[in-house]
Amino acid sequence: DMENKRSFVRMDTLYKIEAEIVIIKIGDYIVRSEANKIVLKDISGNGVAFLTDKYIDLSKEITAEISFKLLNTDIELVGDLVRLETVGDPFDYLYGVKVSSGNLTEDEMYKLLMKTGVYFKNVTPENSSIWKEYKNLWVE
């Protein structure tokens, strides 16, 4: 049943998916930080985890915009940073984000993730005609 989608539809990014994050709210204060590059670790319909070398203090509620591209689809998400783990080299920190809104519905996001998983299942540099277009997603 699709009520439990979160348990079954989560894409661990075997590919390097670069994204940008902008902090838009700290506690009760509306802010707009500079965009910072991050690398997505996993994506689900209602959350993402990302890696960065930047420390973000989570003692206050932090809301951020995260944008990236997946299968030529621009994704823009807004959510609260809900967890922080220290992970070490080459990135220092892993953050979890609970998504509250975005340019896709949760169901549209799940469908895109399923499509992406099928699309990349057999992608290697040797067998893919799309390699040149997506080579920046490959873990080196």
Explain the meaning of each model-derived region.
Residues 77-84:
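Short beta-strand-centered aromatic/proline hotspots
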Residues 13, 36, 62, 75-77, ...:
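Hydrophobic core residues within well-ordered beta-strands of beta-rich domains
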Residues 17-22, 60-74:
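Short conserved beta-strand and strand-loop elements enriched in small hydrophobics
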